[in-house]
Amino acid sequence: MDEAGFVQTQPNRSAWTETGEVHLITAARGKRLNVMAALISTGELFTAKFWETTTAALFGGFLGLLLESVGRPLTVILDNASIHKAKEIQPLLALLKEKGLTLYFLPPYSPELNRVEKLWHKMKYEWMAFKARNSAGLEADVDKFWTVSALIIE
């Protein structure tokens, strides 16, 4: 399980300038589409997307919906992001634990162990065209990958 953010304007990955000149990159930020995804052992991808900032409360809600959707005891493998361990959601996490949820935290700085990280990398750097988008275009581009993405993650 992991979170990622997608912005309307792609970041500059490289630039070209004459030797001795400074290349200035202006900081232009558009709206950010945040996505949470969990890869289920069946190969299904459970996702949620939202334009709001990713918070511990949204994370807790996502876990509740995930557990309800799967409908059986569930172990979620995740990183050590602060929203995953926030004090404000500890009562909710305790309740979800009683309902069959177990959280397994990966070692720090080990994104290669999180299979959903592979999805984010492919979406951001391989599949999505390097272009500016409006909000609707960004959401449509992110949506079109959900149907094939679970098959790609290995």
Per-region residue spans from a language model:
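Short functional hotspots at interaction and active-site rims
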Residues: 1-154
